[in-house]
Structures are given as structure tokens and as C-alpha cells.
Amino acid sequence: MRTIDKRIAPNVKLATALVARAPTLTLAYDARCKSRLAATLDTGEEVALVLPRGTVLRDGDVLVADDGALVRVAAAHEAVLLVRAPDALTLTRAAYHLGNRHTPVEVGAGCLKLEYDPVLADMLTRLGATIERANAPFQPEAGAYGGGHRHGHDATFAEDYALAQQVFDEHHGRSHSHSHSHSHDHDHDHDHDHDHDHQHGPSCSHGHGHGHR
């Protein structure tokens, strides 16, 4: 069994004829998010996918097998929801609520696409959006720092968080040498002369001497 262990960077230009002759590996989105996978090429050949951790494959990516042969990635048709709305505000609200749930979304012209989910379909309908179930390739937006399928409970979430923290530090953090020198000299000189002349007799007459008139 051949092993596929490299992805050619998108900015590397390959001869169109060379890529066209390469066998195709057609995968649904969920499978394209896995760096370790037993898969079958469209030719029927079984292969092992062993890519760097956190790799998310996209339609059109070109991979390299251990024998140097090329393999082309294609996004499979799968069950999706097409989300449209009567106005921009409703579509924006839909996108906000989906993002709040860390839902992978493909953004189109006046349309959002996401993996089929009846619960989300109901939520979006309640927001005023129009939902259509379809069978189509799904290629959601990548994360702002290069990720794809990342949630708070995923191991790869830590990678995005670390990158985000690095960007923040570069712009606002350690490199700016903010010497905040928080020396709070609280010389409040609290002279609380309460004159608590507590005559703890039977009547406990508290002579506090606060001068409250």
C-alpha cells in the first residue's frame, strides 16, 4: 500500500497536464480534516494518508505519495444546507449564530453553506432564514490563522490560540516594553480614632465617641 505523506503548497505552480494525469482522491469535508486516514483513490487503489497534524485538505490540493507520484484532491458531494435570507441583516445574524457555535461555514454570494444538521436548520429558520437541503461539495472558510475544522475541544485549537496570542503579543504585548510599574503607594494614613470606650457592663453602653449629632 502506498503512503501519501506530503501536500504541495498552493503557491507552487505545476504543469496542468501533469496534474490532470494524476489519480483523484475524492473526500468529504470531515475526511479532509483527518491527517491519518485509510482511503481509496478513484482508481480503486487503497492508500494510507499520513499528513502533518492539523492539515485540512481542500478541493484541488495536490499530494505526493512515497513513490513520488502525484494525487489530486477533490471535494466529494455531501449533504449540506444552503442558507439564504430576505435581507443582509438576517443573513448576518445567521452567520453570527453559526460562528458562535464554531460551525464550519462556506460563504457564497448571498448564501451560506454548512454540513446538514436538522437542529441548526431549525434554529436558522427561526431566525428568518430560508433553508434548502442539497447535495454538493463543501469547502468552508479556513480559520483566520490557517486552520479549518477547529473547536475549543480539539487538540488543534491550541495551535490557533497560540498563533493568535503570538499576533497579539507582536502588536500589543511583550515587544512594546510596557513598563507599567504598578507601585501603588497607598499612604492613606487611616487615623481611625474611634475612641471605642466599651464599658462592657450589664447595659453594655458603647461610648463610641463618633461625634454623630
Swiss-Prot record:
Localization recorded for this chain is: Cytoplasm
Region of interest: Disordered: 170-213
Give any GO molecular function from the UniProt entry: unfolded protein binding
- Which UniProt keyword terms apply here? Chaperone, Cytoplasm, Nickel, Nickel insertion
The reply to whether Cytoplasm figures as a keyword in the UniProt entry is yes
GO annotation terms (biological process): protein folding; protein-containing complex assembly; urea metabolic process
Which superkingdom?
A: Bacteria
Main location (coarse class): cytoplasm
Spell out the Basic and acidic residues composition-biased ranges. Answer: 182-200
UniProt KW Chaperone keyword: yes
Output the Gene Ontology cellular-component terms: cytoplasm
Q: Pfam families per the record?
A: UreE_C, UreE_N
Q: Please give the function described in this protein's UniProt entry.
A: Involved in urease metallocenter assembly. Binds nickel. Probably functions as a nickel donor during metallocenter assembly.
**UniProt record similarity statement:** Belongs to the UreE family.
NCBIfam families hit by this protein? PRK13261.1-1, PRK13263.1
Its name, as the record gives it, is: Urease accessory protein UreE
What is the species listed in this Swiss-Prot or TrEMBL entry? Burkholderia thailandensis (strain ATCC 700388 / DSM 13276 / CCUG 48851 / CIP 106301 / E264)
Its ancestry begins with: Bacteria, Pseudomonadati, Pseudomonadota, Betaproteobacteria, Burkholderiales
